[in-house]
């Protein structure tokens, strides 16, 4: 986890520990050399320095090792949103343009219909439509006890993804694939491949 905004120490010109270029997280900046200099050269390959916690390996590992930061609010990663195919759209079974409407705060999405008869789960609503529904729900003569819940932005997508039961969806898709043909079958196969990868790696 990256916990500091610093990049490089201006005195030593070495990456700051726990910063954006941290050697402990991403790997050494020089081949076969730890941060503190205790271990140098290839003979120490694979050793993790007990003093600075940096693994003695090639510096090129920095190109693919990834860290993470904790944010105040969820955001969607552009690789999974805009990539081809869009994994978020495939998992949620929602068209990419609708997913973008939610992420970019253009539309609300229904997370729970409550007692409202005209709403559907994952339905998109404009701000005006949601204001109308709110007026209806909170009217004095309203018969709605369980209020509908809507969300917007990446936080709403996070909630939709958390609501997915991947094992159950995989089972249903396998049954559906046996009775499907053509383009529909290809779409279902694409979706089950993504779900199977999540299940195989136990990703969350």
UniProtKB/Swiss-Prot annotation:
Chain positions recorded as Zn(2+) binding sites: 34, 36, 49, 52
InterPro entries membership: DNA-dir_RpoC_beta_prime (IPR045867), RNA_pol_Rpb1_1 (IPR007080), RNA_pol_Rpb1_clamp_domain (IPR044893)
Mitochondrion as UniProt keyword: no
Record-linked SUPFAM superfamilies: beta and beta-prime subunits of DNA dependent RNA-polymerase
Catalysed transformations (reactions): RNA(n) + a ribonucleoside 5'-triphosphate = RNA(n+1) + diphosphate
Cofactors: Zn(2+)
EC number of this enzyme: 2.7.7.6
Pfam families linked: RNA_pol_Rpb1_1
GO molecular function, one term: DNA-directed RNA polymerase activity
GO CC annotation terms, alphabetical: DNA-directed RNA polymerase complex
Family: Belongs to the RNA polymerase beta' chain family. RpoC1 subfamily.
Assembly, per entry: In cyanobacteria the RNAP catalytic core is composed of 2 alpha, 1 beta, 1 beta', 1 gamma and 1 omega subunit. When a sigma factor is associated with the core the holoenzyme is formed, which can initiate transcription.
Protein name: DNA-directed RNA polymerase subunit gamma
Originating organism: Prochlorococcus marinus (strain DV1)
Lineage start: Bacteria, Bacillati, Cyanobacteriota, Cyanophyceae, Synechococcales
